[in-house]
C-alpha cells in the first residue's frame, strides 16, 4: 500500500505518533532546516512555527502539498495566494483556543472595571487600600463585539451571564435576531458612542486592517475601554497611543500589538491606562495541543474517505 507522506512538527509527536492510521507515513521535524528538507515530500503538512516567515518558507517548499493543517486560528502570516494557486486545502485552529480567549476578555473587563492592577500594585507595596480603585460594574454595561466567529460567540455567551448588553457586528442580520442587538458593517461606526466596551475579535484581513483608527477612537465614549484579542493590525496603534495618552478613551486591554514582541521602548508600555498581555490569551490553558491533535486525527479519517475536513479556511477571504 502506498502511504501518504505527512510532515509534522515534532511538538505534536507525542500526541499523534501512536494514533496515526496505517496509511500515513509520518515524518517529524525539530527545526526549520529539517522542515525545509522534508517539505517537498509532504502530501499532508502541519508546519506550525513561532516565526511566521520560517513557516511561510516551508509552505512554499512543499510543492506537492494537498492539505495543510495549522493550530493557529489566524492565517494572516501564510502565503494564501500560493495555497490557492496550488489547490491546497487549509484547515486552521478556529475554536481551539476560543474558551480561554473568551475567558481572557472577561478577565480584562473585570481587571479594568475593578482597578485590579492597582490592587496588585498596592499588595506589592504592602499598602492596605481603604477604597476600591475601580467602581464599575459589568451589570447593565453595553459592549460592542466585532467578530462573531467561535471566539466571538463564546464572548457573547459569557458576557450575557454578567448581564452585559451585547451588540454584535455581523455581515447580515439573522432573520431570527429581532434586530436591536445586531449591527451590520456599515452601521457600527455611527453607534460607537453608545458602548462602554468595544471588543475586537475579527480575523486579520485587508478589510479589517486599521479598522479602529483616530476617527473611531474619537467617536467612542471617554469612559470606554477598547479590548483587542484579534490582531494588532486591526488598530492604528499610533492613534491609540494618542487617544490613551490624552484620555480620549479611558483604557485599552491589548492582548495583541504591532509588532510582536512589543519593543521595550514602545510608548504603550508607559501608559498607565494600557493593559498589555503579550498575546498570552490563547496560551492560558493546557489543552491546545490535545484538542488540535484530536481534531487532526478526526480529519485524517475524513480525508481518507474523501469527506470535507474542518474547519476549512476560505483562501480568498482569509478565514
State what each model feature region is.
Residues 1-89, 213:
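An N-terminal-biased, well-structured beta-alpha scaffold segment characteristic
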Residues 7, 143-145:
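Hydrophobic Val/Ile/Leu positions in short beta-strands of Rossmann-like dinucleotide-binding domains
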Residues 161-178:
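NAD(P)-binding Rossmann-fold cofactor-contacting core
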Residues 173-267:
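Rossmann-like adenosine-cofactor binding region
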Amino acid at each position: 500500500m502506498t502511504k501518504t507522506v505527512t510532515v509534522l512538527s515534532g511538538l505534536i509527536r507525542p500526541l499523534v505518533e501512536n494514533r496515526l492510521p496505517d496509511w500515513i507515513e509520518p515524518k517529524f521535524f525539530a527545526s526549520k532546516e529539517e522542515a525545509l528538507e522534508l517539505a517537498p515530500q509532504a502530501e499532508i503538512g502541519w508546519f506550525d512555527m513561532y516565526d511566521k516567515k520560517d513557516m511561510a518558507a516551508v509552505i512554499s517548499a512543499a510543492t506537492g502539498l494537498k492539505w495543510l493543517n495549522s493550530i493557529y486560528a489566524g492565517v494572516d502570516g501564510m502565503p494564501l495566494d500560493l495555497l490557492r494557486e496550488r489547490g491546497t486545502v487549509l484547515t486552521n485552529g478556529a475554536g481551539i483556543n476560543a474558551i480561554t480567549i473568551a475567558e481572557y476578555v472577561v478577565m480584562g473587563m473585570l481587571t479594568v472595571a475593578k482597578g485590579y492592577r492597582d490592587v496588585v500594585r498596592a499588595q506589592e507595596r504592602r499598602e492596605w487600600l481603604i477604597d476600591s480603585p475601580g467602581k464599575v460594574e459589568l451589570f447593565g454595561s453595553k459592549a460592542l463585539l466585532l467578530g462573531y466567529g467561535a471566539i466571538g460567540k463564546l464572548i457573547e455567551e459569557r458576557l450575557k451571564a454578567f448581564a452585559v448588553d451585547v451588540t454584535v457586528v455581523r455581515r447580515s442580520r439573522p432573520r431570527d435576531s429581532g434586530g436591536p442587538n445586531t449591527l451590520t458593517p456599515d452601521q457600527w461606526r455611527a453607534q460607537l458612542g453608545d458602548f462602554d466596551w468595544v471588543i475586537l475579535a475579527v480575523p486579520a484581513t485587508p478589510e479589517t486592517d486599521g479598522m479602529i483608527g483616530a476617527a473611531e477612537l474619537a467617536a467612542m465614549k471617554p469612559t470606554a475601554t477598547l479590548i483587542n484579542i484579534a490582531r494588532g493590525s486591526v488598530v492604528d496603534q499610533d492613534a491609540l497611543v494618542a487617544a490613551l495618552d490624552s484620555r480620549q478613551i479611558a483604557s485599552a486591554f491589548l492582548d495583541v500589538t504591532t509588532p510582536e514582541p512589543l519593543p521595550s521602548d514602545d510608548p504603550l508600555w508607559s501608559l498607565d491606562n494600557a493593559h498589555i498581555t503579550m498575546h498570552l490569551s490563547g496560551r492560558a490553558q493546557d489543552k491546545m495541543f490535545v484538542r488540535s491533535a484530536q481534531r487532526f486525527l478526526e480529519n485524517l479519517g475524513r480525508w481518507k474517505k474523501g469527506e470535507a475536513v474542518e474547519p476549512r479556511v476560505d483562501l480568498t477571504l482569509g478565514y
